[in-house]
Amino acid sequence: MPMGSLQPLATLYLLGMLVASCLGRLSWYDPDFQARLTRSNSKCQGQLEVYLKDGWHMVCSQSWGRSSKQWEDPSQASKVCQRLNCGVPLSLGPFLVTYTPQSSIICYGQLGSFSNCSHSRNDMCHSLGLTCLEPQKTTPPTTRPPPTTTPEPTAPPRLQLVAQSGGQHCAGVVEFYSGSLGGTISYEAQDKTQDLENFLCNNLQCGSFLKHLPETEAGRAQDPGEPREHQPLPIQWKIQNSSCTSLEHCFRKIKPQKSGRVLALLCSGFQPKVQSRLVGGSSICEGTVEVRQGAQWAALCDSSSARSSLRWEEVCREQQCGSVNSYRVLDAGDPTSRGLFCPHQKLSQCHELWERNSYCKKVFVTCQDPNPAGLAAGTVASIILALVLLVVLLVVCGPLAYKKLVKKFRQKKQRQWIGPTGMNQNMSFHRNHTATVRSHAENPTASHVDNEYSQPPRNSHLSAYPALEGALHRSSMQPDNSSDSDYDLHGAQRL
């Protein structure tokens, strides 16, 4: 290939490296990729958030051309679980309880690629959820003094829980291995083995014993596609000492059996746990309790085993809220109301939920909100707009209204003038301040013809009051003032 054709290729390669370095973490397979799981009480399950160059972003489940309800093969997110120090991925799909305190993004291209992402509206984004297996808690091995004699080389006794197809971690049939011999353990319902079961769950690093699983028969039919190594072994052991403190003293070997009930336990460390949420309230810390069964959410029905607040305290903690403030049972007036039922006191003890097809009484729980909601942006904008309109209204209409009020007030204080009010009256007078105004009932014909003048007549060389001068002249000729008028004609003076 000529050297001239290599230069454009080298330029494109360098440009691609520059774009990749600007975008930062392009895929969850990159060694420096950062991710976290939020909105749950475990670091190994929750809402997937990734860190790009400008901060943390919630990943929408519609990314990479998927629908908001599509579930993916969880093994594709194994690198994310490894970076979170969790076990294998159990589920990858819509988280359903969407909480978006920060920005959300939709990405395109191959699954797990973040080189082509765009910001999405929070109300259009459904969060992507990931559930990984919880890591096993390791305990330091007990130190024992070295044996005086060299034992026969053999594997130490050990236990294993075999879950049924689609089962849970820390739940299943107990298998015991001693040396080269391994098998299941025979179990009878009348056996008093509470201490033994707690010892077994603790030895399996699965917490404490919760319950026996429903009757499980050894040698059950193999499910299609299930590997043979996941099938329970035949019965080889029987309980010997229910108070044992070491595995080699707990069981004794018996003749192999192909059928019979075997020991199957459910321990408190089972995974995945029941997920809950609060809906229909004013915030994520208030509402009706719903639980998840597979990919579906349904109302949690009230039960007699949950009369205390322990269950609701656990629900509030899962929502990352404070302690429970109150809870009340809603009346199930509809006989067709359906939901899910947990027979245990706490939801963390329920490895399966039962259906209730009628008279499901929902529970409304109110938790303490660590971040109470303030005024919404729309409310603040409305208040500001109303204040602006009020100021504009005062600026435009205020001066005009003020002038009208001042004018009206001044008119009331101005002097009132009385002019001719009848056909035979040709005089106008100043009203005497000492005269008593008669009622309108005595002079109804003049009650509506009073004249008001804003200013008195200006002085001139001509008489401004000829009628008044005539009246004065007549009054001098007729000294008796027998008129019923309210005006003092004797006291009138020429202006």
UniProtKB/Swiss-Prot annotation:
SMART domains: SR. Gene3D superfamilies: SRCR-like domain. One of its GO terms (molecular function) is signaling receptor activity. Residues 25-372 are extracellular. The chain crosses the membrane at residues 373-402. One of its GO terms (biological process) is apoptotic signaling pathway. The modification Phosphotyrosine is found at residue 453. Phosphorylated on serine, threonine and tyrosine residues following TCR stimulation. Phosphorylated by LCK on Tyr-453 and Tyr-487 upon TCR engagement. InterPro entries: SRCR, SRCR-like_dom_sf, Tcell_CD5. Residues 403-495 are cytoplasmic. The keyword Kinase does not apply. Glycans are attached at residues 116, 241. It is found in: Cell membrane. Keywords: Cell membrane, Disulfide bond, Glycoprotein, Membrane, Phosphoprotein, Receptor, Repeat, Signal, Transmembrane, Transmembrane helix. Pfam families: SRCR. Residues 35-133, 159-268, 276-368 form the SRCR domain. Residues 136-155, 436-460, 473-495 are annotated as: Disordered. The modification Phosphoserine is found at residues 439, 460, 483, 485. One of its GO terms (cellular component) is plasma membrane. Residues 142-155 have a biased composition (Pro residues). Residues 1-24 form the signal peptide. Its main location: membrane. Interacts with CD72/LYB-2. Interacts with PTPN6/SHP-1. Interacts with CBL. Interacts with CD5L. Interacts with CD3Z/CD247. This is T-cell surface glycoprotein CD5. The gene is CD5.
